[in-house]
Each structure stands twice: as structure tokens, then as C-alpha cells.
């Protein structure tokens, strides 16, 4: 055990004046955890106490501030630090400590559970029932139910198994954190004679930080930083972005499927429904025509037929394109389909989390900033002026954000090139494998280009993408 390490590498965040305090000082971390928990509980309470649309605090706390602003921004910068301050994980460590500490049954040790909860429980409902999650009461019930369920799991099972397997965003956070330019590890020279393993003992997830470098993986680390308070030989290093994805590591099937399904549910579906759906020829697209046809025979009521079919087509097309592309790529590489699929599928990581930054920045400056701040003003009854948007949709500088999705495409291609190095095949075979294995990246690129072409050629649909009123009543 190292009690105090005086000299740290230049890229070690723990050795940096301000960031070192933010990420290593346990008092500071605990304050942030308590504040996050307090906001979470108050947001749920407000959803029950004031379930009407006037309560903008609950809506924009969960669906503006936590998701997607804080989570996406931190995932691409420092990694899954939201998990380190998550109210469920924060309280879960203490519940587990006094719980039954049973092994989670194998049928529950399935990371696809969390992915499907997110995919169907959030995104499918988001498109099928527009505005459902905007209702404060629905949001309150969702997070109250998840909290009760999580606490039961923490009490029953050891090693924070709920976070690993059943949390709706657990696998998503673990997968996309590989994009970030940070990596938790240890100083090898300090660890070589260690026999007490305080960093591993302190970890509530039963992980061994001293093995992360060798495995080229932080596994299920949530950056709670408990290990760094137990031993000063732990480092939180700034590394090359996507460093892990450029090298060999043990793949996990659920991670690749998280990339595929989230890209399909967010990037592709929004490209169909919110992108092309705002063009003058929206009625000519297959999901629109299918919706019109289905409505002749089915009463959708309050459901959005267009949203349902845009989501369905985007998901099916994405999966089919990936399967066909990877199958052909496996033939060129003379490798099994499984190895090809799950080794090269990590190239899809940047599409949503990097490409989505363009929409995130645009949305934040043109309405989410005001929504979030005014929501907090309402929630805490502050007697101050409501704020206005930081920018207008007509501001010329917003056009420069359109380059970000193309950077995500280049990033995905670069990851794929490096992961193809893990296969033994001739250069010409790898070239053809690259063309087909990158099918989802190319599909994403094509959607960006085509959407721009349609807007330029046919223009926007009248009254498209109008934003809700900013009037907020106390």
C-alpha cells in the first residue's frame, strides 16, 4: 500500500492542482454525491407533488440536465463519472454492505437486460407516445420504481450486481466510456511488491485496478474513486482518446449490441423522424407511407404511427446492414462471424456519442439551457428573472456544428482500421473487409449527406420543428 505518492506522471489527473481535488478528494466527491442524490430525490418528489405540465423542474432535471447534457458531455471527456455520483450506486454501496450478499443467479447476470430496458422502456415509448416522458408524474413513477427495484437488488446480491447487469444505462455507460481520453490504472513499480491489494479490497464492485493496464480494460469501474483513497498508487491518466479501442481486449457482446441499438434508436431514428421528418417530402418516405397505410386498418389513438414506423425501420435497417456487412467481412478475413462481428463492432462507438454532440450543443444553446435554468427557478421557487435562450436556430455559427457527425464517421473508420490489425489476412482482404464491416458507419454517413441534400433540394416542411412555449407559470 502506498500512503502518499509525491511524484506522479504528467498525464495523471490526480497530480493536477484543480482536477486532482475534483477526482481524488473524498470529501469533495461525497459532497457531489449528496448533492446529486438530493436533486434526484427532490425531482422525484416534485413529480408526484406537482404532476402538471407547469412543473418543468422534474422534466428538465432528468431529461435535460442529467440526460443528455451531463452524461454525454462527461462520457466523451472523463468517462463514466456519472456512475460514480449516481444516487443508486451511492446508496447501493451501503445497502450492499448490510445486505444478504448473495451471488446473483446466472439468468440475471445478463447485460442485455439493462440494454433492453433502456431500448424498449425509454426509446420505444419515446417515439410511440410523444410527450409521455415529458409528463412529470410519468418521470417520477419511472425513477421511483427503478430506485425501489435497484435497492432490492443491492440488498439481495453482492458486488453491485445491479449496476453491472440490470441498470438501464450501466452497459451503455461502460461501453461508451471507451471513447473517453481517460483511463484508471496503477503505477506498476509501486504495485509489484504489493501483497495487501487495498485498491481491490476497497472496490465495491470487486474489481482489481492493478490489472486494468494488462487487460486494456477498466471492466465495470464506475470511477467512484474508492480505490484511490485506499492506495495512492492508483492513477487516473489522460490517454489518447479511444485508446482501448485501438488495441486488443476481451470483447463483450452486450457492448457491441449497445452501440448498434443505441445508434439505431437515437442517431438513425432521429435522422428519419426528426431529420427527414422536417423536410417538405416527409410523406414520401417509407415509414410515413407505412404509417398512413396502417392507420387505415388500425386505430393508433394517442400513439404516433409515424414515430413507431420510423423507429422500426431504423432499427431493422441498422441490424440488417450490420449483419450482412459483418458476414461478408468475415468471409474476406477467413474468420468466424462471431469474432468478426464482436471485434470490429466497436468501430460503431463514436456514431452516437460523438456524432450526437452536434445536436446536443445545438439543443442546449437554442432551448435546453433556458429550459433547465427556468426549470430550476420553478423547482426552487426562486424570485429571479427567467433566462432566455443562448442562441437562435437562425444563428449562422450553428452550421459549423454539422462537421461533428463527419468527425464521428472518420473516428469510426479509424477505429475499424486499427481493429482490423487484430486479424491475420492480406491487405487486399482487409480492404474489402473494411468496406463491408463499416456498413453501419457508412449508413450513418449516407443519412447525414442525404438529409442535407433533401433540405437543400426540397426545403423544410412548413411549421417544422417548432419548439414549445417558454412561458412558465409559478
Regions found by a protein language model. Name each.
Residues 226-248:
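Juxtamembrane amphipathic/hinge helix adjacent to a transmembrane helix
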Residues 169, 221-224:
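Hydrophobic core positions of alpha-helical segments in small-molecule transporters
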Residues 213-221:
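Short linker/helix segments within small regulatory modules
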Residues 210-214, 238:
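Inter-helical turn/loop segments and adjacent helix faces that build the functional surface
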Residues 1-211, 229, 247-474:
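Non-ligating segments of multi-cofactor redox enzymes
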Amino acid at each position: 500500500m502506498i500512503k502518499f505518492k509525491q511524484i506522479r506522471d504528467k498525464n495523471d489527473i490526480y497530480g493536477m492542482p484543480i482536477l486532482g481535488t475534483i477526482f481524488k478528494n473524498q470529501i469533495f466527491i461525497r459532497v457531489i454525491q449528496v448533492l446529486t442524490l438530493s436533486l434526484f430525490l427532490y425531482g422525484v418528489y416534485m413529480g408526484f407533488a406537482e404532476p402538471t405540465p407547469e412543473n418543468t423542474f422534474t422534466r428538465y432535471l432528468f431529461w435535460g440536465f442529467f440526460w443528455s447534457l451531463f452524461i454525454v458531455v462527461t462520457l466523451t471527456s472523463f468517462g463514466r463519472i456519472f456512475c460514480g455520483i449516481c444516487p443508486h450506486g451511492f446508496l447501493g454501496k451501503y445497502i450492499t454492505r448490510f445486505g444478504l450478499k448473495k451471488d446473483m443467479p446466472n439468468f440475471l447476470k445478463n447485460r442485455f437486460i439493462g440494454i433492453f430496458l433502456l431500448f424498449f422502456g425509454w426509446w420505444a415509448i419515446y417515439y410511440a407516445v410523444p410527450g409521455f416522458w415529458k409528463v412529470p408524474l410519468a418521470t417520477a413513477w419511472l425513477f421511483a420504481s427503478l430506485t425501489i427495484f435497484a435497492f432490492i437488488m443491492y440488498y439481495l446480491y453482492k458486488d453491485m450486481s445491479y449496476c453491472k447487469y440490470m441498470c438501464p444505462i450501466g452497459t451503455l455507460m461502460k461501453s461508451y466510456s471507451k471513447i473517453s481520453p481517460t483511463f484508471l490504472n496503477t503505477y506498476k513499480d509501486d504495485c509489484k511488491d504489493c501483497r495487501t491489494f487495498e485498491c481491490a479490497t476497497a472496490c465495491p464492485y470487486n474489481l482489481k485496478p492493478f490489472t486494468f493496464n494488462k487487460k486494456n480494460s477498466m471492466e465495470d469501474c464506475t470511477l467512484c474513486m474508492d480505490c484511490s483513497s485506499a492506495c495512492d498508487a492508483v492513477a487516473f491518466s489522460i490517454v489518447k482518446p479511444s485508446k482501448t479501442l485501438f488495441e486488443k481486449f476481451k470483447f463483450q457482446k452486450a457492448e457491441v449490441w449497445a452501440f448498434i441499438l443505441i445508434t439505431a434508436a437515437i442517431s438513425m431514428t432521429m435522422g428519419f423522424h426528426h431529420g427527414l421528418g422536417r423536410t417538405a417530402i416527409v410523406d414520401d418516405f417509407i415509414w410515413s407511407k407505412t404509417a398512413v397505410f396502417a392507420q387505415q386498418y388500425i386505430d393508433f389513438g394517442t400513439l404516433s404511427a409515424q414515430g413507431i414506423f420510423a423507429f422500426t425501420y431504423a432499427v431493422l435497417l441498422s441490424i440488417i446492414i450490420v449483419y450482412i456487412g459483418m458476414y461478408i467481412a468475415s468471409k474476406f478475413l477467413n474468420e468466424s462471424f462471431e469474432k468478426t462481428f464482436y471485434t470490429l463492432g466497436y468501430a460503431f462507438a463514436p456514431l452516437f456519442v460523438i456524432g450526437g454532440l452536434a445536436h446536443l450543443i445545438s439543443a442546449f444553446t437554442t432551448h435546453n439551457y433556458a429550459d433547465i435554468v427556468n426549470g430550476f427557478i420553478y423547482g426552487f421557487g426562486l424570485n429571479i428573472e427567467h433566462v432566455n435562450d443562448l442562441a437562435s436556430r437562425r444563428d449562422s455559427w450553428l452550421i459549423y456544428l454539422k462537421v461533428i457527425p463527419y468527425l464521428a464517421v472518420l473516428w469510426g473508420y479509424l477505429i475499424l482500421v486499427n481493429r482490423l490489425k487484430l486479424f491475420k489476412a492480406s491487405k487486399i482482404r482487409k480492404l474489402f473487409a473494411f468496406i463491408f464491416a463499416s456498413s453501419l458507419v457508412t449508413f450513418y454517413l449516407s443519412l447525414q449527406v442525404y438529409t442535407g441534400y433533401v433540405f437543400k433540394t426540397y426545403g423544410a416542411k412548413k411549421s417544422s420543428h417548432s419548439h414549445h412555449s417558454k412561458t412558465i407559470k409559478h
